[in-house]
Each structure stands twice: as C-alpha cells, then as structure tokens.
A protein has these predicted regions:
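Soluble catalytic domains of membrane acyltransferases
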Residues: 19, 35-193, 198-201
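Extreme N-terminal tail/first-helix region
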Residues: 2-42
C-alpha cells in the first residue's frame, strides 16, 4: 500500500502499539516538506510495540534528512544510537527529543548487550539501525542489528530508500533464525531493487 503525503500535509495514522510522539505542530511542517520534495511512503507499519528497524541503502547524509523528516511527520518515536559525547553539549537535548540513545563505546559490555538491556527494560521500543554502518560501499553488512534482534527476541522491519522513485518502502516483518548468513542474504535480497542516492545496498 502506498501513502503519499496529502495536500494538507496529512499522513496515515500509526498502529496503536507503535511508539509515538505526542502531537506537535512540527509534524505538519515536516509533512509539507516531504510533499514538496515528492517523497512518499510505501507499505504499512506492523502493530507491534518492539522491533528493530533497519534502513538501507545508506549512501548519503541526505538519507538521514529524509528519514528524520518522515519520522517527525509521522510522529513515529523510532530510537537511534549515537555516541555519548554528542549528548554532552547543547545538541544533546535535541537528540534525546528525537529519540537518540547515548552509547558508551568504551564500556566493558558491548553495544549488543546495551541494546538488549534497553529492549528488556522497555515495553515499547523501535530501534533504527543502518546495517551498512557507513555511507561508503561495503561488501558485508555489520551484523549487530541481527544479534540485537535475536537476543531481544524481536522481529526485524526493513525500510528502504529509493531515490529514483523518491519512496521510502516499509518491507515485510522478518523473523531472525539461527542462521546469520542465510538471514543476511535474505534481507539483502529484499534491498536489491532499491537505489540509494549514490548506489544500491
């Protein structure tokens, strides 16, 4: 199902179980910007309180711009990770309001353990991750998102940027199995048709 931003800036309602921000005037402004730039949302969000969202291809800083505009326009409270140092200055307040989670990279316990603990402590959490881990072309995805989803026992929701059609596509839910390599191959196959700003996934 395709959802185009309407002339009045409207977007489809989110499912009840999905984490959401309270209503805010900024949502309409972001929806207007998306409409003016021709971007649209394809697919539907599952009615689940906890999952891992993966976004690809990630080939430009513009991905963050369009993703953030869509997130705010929808009122979707999708969390994301950032290094703890970014939260110490004046930017920290804004990052937290937008769903940022400070990460202790030097902590004794690893990133996966930090996020699994966050899932176990949160009745509602959608965690967004770019599996490529960089805007540069990579031959292999980082597998942290898969390990987080497996350990937290939550599904994976693929989201794909396609610049030629200016769409953000929400894919079908993916249940991680015990086979990391097979799962990564299946997920990358989903992303094969989509084209980022500078390359495919």
């Amino acid at each position: 199902m395709e959802h185009r931003v309407s002339a009045d800036g409207g977007l489809p309602a989110l499912p009840p179980a999905m984490p959401q921000f309270p209503p805010h005037p900024l949502r309409r402004a972001c929806a207007w910007l998306l409409r003016r730039c021709g971007w649209r949302l394809v697919g539907e969000f599952p009615d689940l309180p906890r999952l891992v969202v993966i976004a690809a291809p990630h080939s430009s800083w513009w991905d963050g711009v369009w993703g953030l505009l869509c997130k705010v326009a929808l009122g979707a409270d999708i969390a994301f990770m950032a290094k703890r140092e970014l939260f110490l200055g004046p930017l920290g307040w804004l990052l937290r309001r937008l769903g940022g989670i400070p990460i202790e990279r030097a902590a004794a316990h690893g990133l996966v353990e930090q996020m699994v603990a966050r899932f176990r402590a949160s009745p509602q959490l959608w965690l967004g991750i770019a599996p490529e881990g960089t805007r540069k072309h990579v031959h292999a995805w980082k597998s942290g998102f898969w390990h987080i989803a497996r350990a937290a026992e939550v599904p994976i929701l693929p989201a794909a940027f396609d610049y030629p059609s200016r769409t953000i596509t929400i894919g079908p839910l993916f249940q991680p199995s015990a086979d990391l390599h097979a799962d990564l191959a299946a997920l990358r196959a989903f992303y094969a048709p989509f084209r980022g700003k500078h390359r495919n996934a």
